């Protein structure tokens, strides 16, 4: 089964009685090069443990599982659980966590599942949780890198240079903890259903040391929020 083939996707979803939820920001990839290139950009290999958020029906999940030592995917939509059980049945290094990633203890999750592996995060993120989720992820300092497909406008904000129109508090936060780069853009025609916006993939290696030393990060972020 080709998880990026429109006909195969529709047959799979019909078999499971699945309908897209706009509230959950569900847009499934229908171009095979996109998950392949995202997985490649993540740097996943046999020494890597990958946390994926919102696997959908599993096209990126499969690409990651072919490369990584272990893939743990967190999915909120219970309607997709039997779908993923079918599409990921041939990958013993895959684990599905049923629930809301915003309620997960990321440090505990990494400790439980990725012992001896280099932890990274790679995902096609639902647009509606991008900012709060990435904030939690980078502040947790649990991951060696973060590679995500997100709305292009948000990607540009994350990668913006100081003093530009796109630069803001979220830019500063992401650049304090990581060194983000925009890797490639993904047109809306690569999704089912097609969103109204262009998307982009960013790769964010974690910084070993922050670019500036501060006495109190809590005070830093209070000042940043006041300044922006």
Describe the residue ranges of each PLM region.
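Catalytic cores of RNA-modifying enzymes
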Residues: 1-226
């Amino acid at each position: 089964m080709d998880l990026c083939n429109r006909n195969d996707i529709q047959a799979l979803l019909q078999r499971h009685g699945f309908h897209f939820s706009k509230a959950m920001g569900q847009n499934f990839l229908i171009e095979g090069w996109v998950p392949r290139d995202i997985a490649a950009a993540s740097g996943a290999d046999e020494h890597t443990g990958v946390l994926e958020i919102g696997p959908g029906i599993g096209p990126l999940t499969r690409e990651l599982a072919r490369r990584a030592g272990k893939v743990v995917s967190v999915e909120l939509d219970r309607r997709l659980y039997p779908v993923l059980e079918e599409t990921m049945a041939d990958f013993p290094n895959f684990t599905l966590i049923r629930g809301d990633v915003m309620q997960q203890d990321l440090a505990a999750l990494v400790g439980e599942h990725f012992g001896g592996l280099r932890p990274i995060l790679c995902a096609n993120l639902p647009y509606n949780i991008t900012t709060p989720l990435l904030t939690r992820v980078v502040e947790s300092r649990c991951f060696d890198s973060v590679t995500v497909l997100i709305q292009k406008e948000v990607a540009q904000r994350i990668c913006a240079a100081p003093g530009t129109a796109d630069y803001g508090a979220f830019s500063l936060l992401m650049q304090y903890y990581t060194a983000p780069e925009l890797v490639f853009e993904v047109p809306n025609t690569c999704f089912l259903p097609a969103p109204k916006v262009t998307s982009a993939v960013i790769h964010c290696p974690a910084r070993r040391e922050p670019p500036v030393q501060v006495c109190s990060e809590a005070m830093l972020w209070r000042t940043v929020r006041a300044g922006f």
